[in-house]
From Swiss-Prot:
Protein name listed in UniProt: Cytochrome b
Gene name, Swiss-Prot/TrEMBL: MT-CYB
Annotated TM spans: 33-53, 77-98, 113-133, 178-198, 226-246, 288-308, 320-340, 347-367
GO MF assignments: metal ion binding; ubiquinol-cytochrome-c reductase activity
Originating organism: Sorex coronatus
Binding site for a ubiquinone: 201
Miscellaneous section: Heme 1 (or BL or b562) is low-potential and absorbs at about 562 nm, and heme 2 (or BH or b566) is high-potential and absorbs at about 566 nm.
UniProt xrefs under PANTHER family: CYTOCHROME B
InterPro entries: Cyt_b/b6_C, Cyt_b/b6_C_sf, Cyt_b/b6_N, Cytb/b6-like_sf, Cytochrome_b, Cytochrome_b_C_euk/bac, Cytochrome_b_N_euk/bac, Di-haem_cyt_TM
Names of required cofactors: heme b
GO biological process: mitochondrial electron transport, ubiquinol to cytochrome c
Membrane topology: Multi-pass membrane protein
Subunit details: The cytochrome bc1 complex contains 11 subunits: 3 respiratory subunits (MT-CYB, CYC1 and UQCRFS1), 2 core proteins (UQCRC1 and UQCRC2) and 6 low-molecular weight proteins (UQCRH/QCR6, UQCRB/QCR7, UQCRQ/QCR8, UQCR10/QCR9, UQCR11/QCR10 and a cleavage product of UQCRFS1). This cytochrome bc1 complex then forms a dimer.
Length: 379
């Protein structure tokens, strides 16, 4: 008799995705981040659900409802900080996952990659709206500044901003709709992640060498289930350490002050995971140009597969491309640092140079270097 897991309509889907899935025998720990992102999403949905039970999306009570969660609800402080720092862990895993894809040429699976880019946008939108909900100073002013960027769109800009606000400024209507969207988007993200996996399993996983691994496959379970569990344990260790020892390390002190439309904070800045894009935004003096650069800094990922000029898929055997990849990583870290600094000399010029280097590396330098490497190998 055939095993039930191979015949049952529901179990055979799970079986073909997580148990009997043929996987390359040489995938490294860099391939763990997909499962870690799944775990992060589950943590965020569960903690978010419990927070939503006690939160009120009204400008008069939002801030005090968050205070109430931390002070009066059983383990409310733990749920709140798991949710806030869980977002940081989510983005760390996301950036490492995307970095892995760029390094090993995983972007050659076009459908999987493009759904991944869509997922990145969805997660960023969700995180932005979630940051507005506690209704602290940085929540309010962050929402005001970022939504105001849409006014740079010619002709329809100002109408669009008022439509998103639900009035003439960020107010009760804005907070209520942001809460509604923040609640629904994670479920859309989960559905998109399912499609992401569906397309990945159509082609099979890439591997560090970038070569076809059909001749050497191993079952996903037990090899990679055990490997993923180790990754999950390390993730939970990092998250709980952060939550229990320094929960406010990655937050902004200004968000412990209730939102006040009459008092602007000295430095308006988003959470750390948006700082690189924020630095690119204010590196361009023109408003519309800045908004375009901000969107393109993420959207450029969708163009990467078409800029692949190398005869090899992975960077594993391409030392020049490897150097450029790590320069790109250093550049993004520089942009993240600049994004958190005040908008003044010398930070403006450093940000402008780092922004130019970011786009140049991806669009020009890396494709040309790949051609050069092909010629070196007489390909």
């Amino acid at each position: 008799m055939t095993n039930l897991r191979k015949t049952h309509p529901l179990m055979k889907i799970v079986n073909s995705s997580f148990i009997d899935l043929p996987a390359p025998s040489n995938i490294s720990s860099w391939w763990n981040f997909g499962s870690l992102l799944g775990v992060c999403l589950i943590i965020q949905i569960l903690t978010g659900l419990f927070l939503a039970m006690h939160y009120t999306s009204d400008t008069m009570t939002a801030f005090s409802s968050v205070t109430h969660i931390c002070r009066d609800v059983n383990y409310g402080w733990l749920i709140r900080y798991l949710h806030a720092n869980g977002a940081s862990m989510f983005f760390i895993c996301l950036f490492l996952h995307v970095g892995r894809g760029l390094y090993y040429g995983s972007y050659m699976y076009l459908e999987t990659w493009n759904i991944g880019v869509l997922l990145l946008f969805a997660v960023m939108a969700t995180a932005f709206m979630g940051y507005v909900l506690p209704w602290g100073q940085m929540s309010f002013w962050g929402a005001t500044v970022i939504t105001n960027l849409l006014s740079a769109i010619p002709y329809i800009g100002s109408d669009l901003v008022e439509w998103i606000w639900g009035g003439f400024s960020v107010d009760k209507a804005t907070l209520t709709r942001f809460f509604a969207f923040h609640f629904i988007l994670p479920f859309i993200i989960a559905a998109l992640a399912g499609v992401h996996l569906l397309f990945l399993h159509e082609t099979g996983s890439n591997n560090p060498s970038g070569l076809c691994s059909d001749a050497d496959k191993i079952p996903f379970h037990p090899y990679y289930t055990i490997k993923d569990i180790l990754g999950v344990l390390l993730l939970i260790l990092a998250l709980t350490s952060l939550v229990l020892f320094s929960p406010d390390l990655l937050g902004d002190p200004d968000n412990y002050t209730p939102a006040n439309p009459l008092n602007t904070p000295p430095h308006i800045k988003p959470e750390w995971y948006f700082l690189f894009a924020y630095a690119i935004l204010w590196s361009i003096p023109n408003k519309l140009g800045g908004v375009l650069a901000l969107v393109l800094s993420i959207l450029i990922l969708a163009v990467v597969p078409f800029l692949h000029t190398s005869k090899q898929r992975s960077m594993m055997f391409r030392p020049f491309s490897q150097c450029l990849f790590w320069i790109l990583v250093a550049d993004l870290l520089t942009l993240t640092w600049i994004g958190g600094q005040p908008v003044e000399h010398p930070f403006i010029i450093i940000g402008q140079l780092a922004s130019i280097l970011y786009f140049l590396l991806i669009l020009v330098i890396m494709p040309i270097t790949s051609v050069f490497e092909n010629n070196l190998l007489k390909w």
